[in-house]
């Protein structure tokens, strides 16, 4: 009986070109493979997923379902993001630099966070914590005073006090003010701990993006300060002689 199935049909059926982003493909044996690009863009390493699974079953007695992680893809993606911004900065003669941060709510597993920090170190990638547990995790994972830590989410007294303790210890930690009450806490604990804070504000933009999150943008956004509230922040900082402490603007289009 003539075989009608082909590798190209498999690629089309599983739509690999749309989601694989050149990291995934199908080899001549019909198995899914993982391509790890080198610095020249060509495949540096190729892994046959079926061979890996078969080896784990035979040698380690680990059976599906199983989760395979390819750290080299993470490393390549961080480099790719950095290079895209670096090229744009050079093209448009921008006088500053790009510095990304990884929101650990995406994946809080320790080895993932550690790899983000390791692979992102040449680019000074930082972390974003969106809750008290994430803040504690982040402070434990970051072992130097140069990696930026951005703090978002709901902030009570304990959260702000912890942030400013870390600041006093020399950490490069920046809380993002999303409500006026958070600014009052920053002022309160900076005086109590005798530390000069650095913080940002999250702004509600009047403009909207498009797509799934369009309805969450603009002044209807749940989080952030209106322009009127931002002006109030500036007035308070002027009264407290703390204008230089505001060094960051955070916003979402949706």
What role is predicted for each listed range?
Residues 1-40:
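N-terminal basic/disordered segments at the start of proteins
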Residues 6, 11-13, 55, 61, ...:
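Short, well-ordered helical secondary-structure segments
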Residues 6-9, 15-17, 49-50, 56-57, ...:
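Short secondary-structure boundary micro-motifs
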Residues 13-16, 22-25, 55-59, 140-142, ...:
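A general structural signal for short secondary-structure junctions and capping/turn motifs
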Residues 14-16, 22, 42-43, 213-215, ...:
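Homeobox/homeodomain signature
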Residues 27-110:
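Low-complexity, highly charged intrinsically disordered N-terminal segments
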Residues 95-254:
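Active-site-proximal beta-alpha core segment in soluble small-molecule metabolic enzymes
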């Amino acid at each position: 009986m003539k075989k009608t199935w082909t590798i190209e049909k498999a690629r089309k059926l599983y739509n690999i070109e749309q989601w694989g982003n050149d990291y995934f493909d199908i080899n001549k044996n019909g198995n899914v493979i993982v391509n790890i690009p080198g610095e020249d863009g060509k495949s540096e390493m190729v892994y046959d997923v079926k061979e890996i699974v078969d080896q784990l079953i035979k040698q380690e007695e680990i059976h599906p379902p199983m989760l395979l992680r390819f750290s080299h893809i993470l490393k390549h993606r961080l480099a790719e993001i950095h290079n895209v911004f670096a090229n744009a900065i050079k093209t448009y003669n921008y006088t500053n630099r790009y510095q990304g941060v990884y929101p650990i709510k995406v994946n809080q597993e320790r080895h993932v966070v550690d790899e983000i920090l390791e692979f992102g170190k040449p680019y000074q990638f930082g972390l974003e914590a969106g809750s008290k547990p994430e803040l504690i995790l982040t402070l434990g994972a970051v072992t130097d005073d140069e990696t930026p830590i951005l703090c978002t989410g709901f902030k009570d007294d304990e959260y702000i006090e912890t942030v400013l303790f870390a600041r006093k210890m020399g950490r490069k930690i920046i809380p993002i003010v999303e409500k006026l009450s958070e600014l009052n806490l920053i002022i309160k604990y900076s005086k109590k701990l005798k530390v000069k804070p650095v913080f940002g504000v999250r702004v509600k933009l009047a403009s909207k993006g498009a797509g799934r999150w369009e309805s969450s943008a603009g002044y209807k956004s749940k989080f952030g300060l209106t322009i009127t509230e931002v002006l109030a922040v500036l007035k308070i900082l002027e009264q407290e002689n703390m204008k230089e402490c505001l060094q960051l603007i955070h916003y979402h289009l949706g």
